[in-house]
Amino acid sequence: MLSYQDKVGAFYKDNARANSSRLSLVTEDQGGRRPPYLLFVLLILLVGIMALLAITGVRFHQVSTSNMEFSRLLKEDMEKSEAVHHQVIDVLTPLFKIIGDEIGLRLPQKLNEIKQFILQKTNFFNPNREFDFRDLHWCINPPSKIKVNFTNYCDTIGIRKSIASAANPILLSALSRSRGDIFPPYRCSGATTSVGSVFPLSVSLSMSLISRTSEIINMLTAISDGVYGKTYLLVPDYLEGEFDTQKIRVFEIGFIKRWLNNMPLLQTTNYMVLPENSKAKVCTIAVGELTLASLCVDESTVLLYHDSNGSQGGILVVTLGIFGATPMDQVEEVIPVPHPSVEKIHITNHRGFIKDSIATWMVPALVSEKQEEQKNCLESACQRKSYPMCNQTSWEPFGGGQLPSYGRLTLPLDPSIDLQLNISFTYGPVILNGDGMDYYESPLLDSGWLTIPPKNGTVLGLINKASRGDQFTVIPHVLTFAPRESSGNCYLPIQTSQIMDKDVLTESNLVVLPTQNFIYVIATYDISRGDHAIVYYVYDPIRTISYTHAFRLTTKGRPDFLRIECFVWDDDLWCHQFYRFEADSTNSTTSVENLVRIRFSCNRSKP
């Protein structure tokens, strides 16, 4: 009987397990032949992975490029949206506001105007109603078959508007050249030089008269906003007899136009000659708004009566338009309407100006009211120090111990009312020169510059600020001082005890330029040089600068009259000057009228 082990061995005798050692050898043999296949599989896997990575990179690049393009397009869209937003805010919103204003505000106003127009048209055909025909449209073209009772108002208003429309281009050209600064810039570090030139007046009426043997005396010129005006006494050569009976009063007005080399040209457009028997020995002048106005008297001092007992004399009023043959050319004697306290006024050959259809002049006035303020000013100033004026017992121009006041003459030029000369007064700095006052318009203030000329080489003159409104005031500006000994509103003009310069034979008026900076000019007839000369002094008190320039004369003589009127043209100072002198060689009197130009320049400027 076989044991267990023998049974097992017999079972596996023909089985593979019995040859297990051989089988293992065969298995090792087969395992040795597998590595090439594995490497091939691994290589394929590696290639697949690299392909996947390449595909992934390409896709990533495409996605990045797509994102960048999308970002660019998005940015462009945002910029376009922002531009549209700004267009809406900056353009459409204001446009909508304008449309809203037009529809909500102006359209109802226009409809209301149309309604009023229709009502006025309808009213013209109502014969039972009276109308005011002062509207220019009804003056020019009244309805047919309607009887209209016209006055001079329609003619004057229509002519004035037509003239203003025609003259506007000339005035604008002149104004654009008359507001500059004549001085070099503040950066000037070198020497300032001045160059002067003299020009004749070729197309002026007065020059044509001077060129003949006729004599012109006491010429007065005023310039305002591109318009000039003159008045003077003419002694024709064909008249014989007493000199005083031969004087003819002449007025002229015209434009300041641009001429050759852009220089100004005073072109006469209208003039008026008063008959010999007219009361026009002494005349003021005012120019503005295309009009000349003048007040004329036979005697400078005018007595004013306030009751019916006195016979009040009239003052001759002359108005002249820029063009002739219009209702604005008129001569009329007017009875003045003075303040009850004004007893006398002193009219001289001095200038004013026209503003808002009102001609205004300044004159010395004698008033009956107590002058305690002025007297106290003098008494307190003279207690401790002796000023030259402290020894005066008579005051110009009226004489006697009463100080003159400041008088203002206003003449409304409204064609709808009659001419009326109103006289008011106020107090101010003490007046030492009674020859007269010039009144210049201030382009920046609701007032004017009141100037009193120097006199006899001892009084330097005076420049005050005078208001134009109903509240008439005079405030000192330059060439005055407040004495330490006095208190309150006390101002005195500068005066010296002796003549400061004996080589100065005569002095002109003080002229304030129509510039933004306060600048004034004065001229003198000087004999200190080898040749006689007219010397100009230009002052700017605010910037504390001043310049001089001398125009040497080819003649020598003794002057008895010197008058200037200055304006700015292309940043240069231009002055119209008129002077009379008695020639030393012939003892004959000669009148000279011309234009002078002073150009200031700087040698070098700071960078």
UniProtKB/Swiss-Prot annotation:
> What residues bear carbohydrate chains?
N149, N309, N391, N422, N456, N587, N603
Membrane-side (Intravirion) residue stretches? 1-37
Q: Identify the SUPFAM superfamilies for this entry.
A: Sialidases
Protein topology in the membrane: Single-pass type II membrane protein
Where is this gene product found? Virion membrane; Host cell membrane
Provide the alphabetized UniProt keywords: Glycoprotein, Hemagglutinin, Host cell membrane, Host membrane, Host-virus interaction, Membrane, Signal-anchor, Transmembrane, Transmembrane helix, Viral attachment to host cell, Viral envelope protein, Virion, Virus entry into host cell
UniProt-recorded Gene Ontology molecular function terms: host cell surface receptor binding
Outline which residue ranges sit on the Virion surface face: 59-607
One GO cellular component, as annotated: host cell plasma membrane
Keyword Transmembrane in record: yes
User: Where, by residue number, does the polypeptide cross the bilayer?
Assistant: 38-58
Q: Which GO terms describe its biological process?
A: symbiont entry into host cell; virion attachment to host cell
Q: A single Pfam family, by name?
A: HN
Indicate the principal place this protein occupies in or around the cell.
virion
Task: Please state which protein family the record places this protein in.
Answer: Belongs to the paramyxoviruses hemagglutinin-neuraminidase family. Non-sialidase subfamily.
Describe, as the record does, how this protein assembles with itself and its partners.
Binds canine SLAMF1 at the cell surface.
Its function?
A: Attaches the virus to cell receptors and thereby initiating infection. Binding of H protein to the receptor induces a conformational change that allows the F protein to trigger virion/cell membranes fusion. The cellular receptor might be SLAM, and may explain the lymphotropism of the virus.
Identify this protein by name: Hemagglutinin glycoprotein
Q: Which organism is it from?
A: Canine distemper virus (strain A92-27/4)
